[in-house]
């Protein structure tokens, strides 16, 4: 079953077409990676899926629900969460405090400081589970004291706090050291298959380590979709994206 389906999506900024008749689907539990050269329309595409951009034409289905043009907060309530290329963390709060705010936002009353003991216990358990899931073990550290890679891990944890069925990751390893990249690969690989993932990524080692299927965008259009092996051996992809002549 498709958790996400995109039909003939189109978006333009004036005369500049950034998404041109894009159709694709994400299956339940799939790890689907979007690749393409700079300016291919990758971020514009997931911004339309997440509600940050309104499509000019086409439709987006999350499960059986048409979410085309919905605002981000409404799409989030339907089970979609995402990260961005630039994080939105509270730098002067601790890891635990950032995660706790995200969990409270998911379950309601994020600013209610008079909370029953049982609910506080459940809240603490949720936060601890999220820390384990994203491989963070120093909950009292302030975010500004974390490494760049650790901040990206925390951002994934905050997205997971919403308990989504579809997670959008926008270049999660961008700017990371090799060690940090390896940690992020391990984190994503260990997320449960009950969660579907759509990811933009430029590091081909990461792409081929994680993906079940890959979609290649070029100039706002789908150049190819297939398994990692199919994409690696596609002559058109090798020429346009990988720069290898057939």
Task: Tell what function each PLM region has.
Residues 2-246:
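Glycine-rich phosphate-binding loops of nucleotide-dependent enzymes
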